[in-house]
From Swiss-Prot:
Family: Belongs to the peptidase S1B family.
Protein name, as recorded: Serine protease SplB
One Gene Ontology molecular-function label: serine-type endopeptidase activity
Keywords annotated in UniProt: Hydrolase, Protease, Secreted, Serine protease, Signal
Keyword Hydrolase: yes
Lineage: Bacteria, Bacillati, Bacillota, Bacilli, Bacillales
Record-listed E.C. numbers: 3.4.21.-
Secretion signal, residue range per the UniProt entry: 1-36
Catalytic-site annotation from UniProt: H75 (charge relay system), D113 (charge relay system), S193 (charge relay system)
Subcellular location: Secreted
Function: Serine protease that cleaves specifically after the sequence Trp-Glu-Leu-Gln.
A cellular component term, taken from the record's GO annotations: extracellular region
Entries under Gene3D superfamilies matching the protein: Trypsin-like serine proteases
Keyword Hydrolase on entry: yes
Length: 240
């Protein structure tokens, strides 16, 4: 994909896909759902991998990258503080992997929309495997890379409050990878910010942060591609 096209699209046609008041879609949800029904799936069991690696914020998504450590977007974490809570892989009223308190927030120093969040190891509300965060979740591993044409999936909590924290999985092809940017054609909505972008082996390719406002067959979504520098930052900030 031409770089200038991507930049113009990001500048003019994208929304940040959390529901924190940063951006709102200009098309009705009914139209979006009809457009995406062939590649969006409701997750039935969040207690199996890869879904055990996903966590919910009040208005967005995150995922586990190591001991007591979650990744999300800067535009998500700026609305949270130490002591606030996250929920591990909730499944509406069918339970969750525990509720945990945030103990540290570290934003990536570059322009990329990446933020590390460390949580207290002991749950405020226990999960099915006890009170320990690491017993109730599964960290993701990195993919070797990604390229145009490969299939990816985005797993997260679109419209989390409205959808009662039901987890959804959306799939589509990679359109382009350039530097720390990855563009893909997968349907995402408000609340998907911070969702993991995974390859067919459920390995991390990047983190989702925005999507086009337009609603047609050319609607793209945007993520931060995990470069060696970003992986190094994450590794250095995993809880010890």
């Amino acid at each position: 994909m031409n770089k200038n096209v991507v930049i113009k699209s990001l500048a003019a046609l994208t929304i940040l896909t959390s529901v924190t008041g940063i951006g709102t879609t200009l098309v009705e949800e009914v139209q979006q759902t009809a457009k995406a029904e062939n590649n969006v799936t409701k997750v039935k069991d969040t207690n199996i991998f890869p879904y055990t690696g996903v966590v919910a914020f009040k208005s967005a998504t995150g995922f586990v990258v190591g001991k007591n450590t979650i990744l999300t977007n800067k535009h998500v974490s700026k609305n949270y503080k130490v002591g606030d809570r996250i929920t591990a892989h909730p499944n509406s009223d069918k339970g969750n992997g525990g509720i945990y308190s945030i103990k540290k927030i570290i934003n990536y120093p570059g322009k990329e929309d990446v933020s590390v969040i460390q949580v207290e190891e002991r749950a405020i509300e226990r999960g099915p495997k006890g009170f320990n965060f690491n017993d109730n979740v599964t960290p993701f591993k990195y993919a070797a890379g990604a390229k145009a044409g490969e299939r990816i999936k985005v797993i997260g909590y679109p419209h989390p409050y409205k959808n009662k924290y039901v987890l959804y999985e959306s799939t589509g092809p990679v359109m382009s990878v350039e530097g720390s940017s990855i563009v893909y054609s997968a349907h995402t909505e408000s609340g998907n910010s911070g969702s993991p972008v995974l390859n067919s082996n459920n390995e991390l390719v990047g983190i989702h942060f925005a999507s086009d406002v337009k609603n047609d067959d050319n609607r793209n979504a945007y993520g931060v591609y995990f470069t060696p520098e970003i992986k190094k930052f994450i590794a250095e900030n995993i809880d010890k």
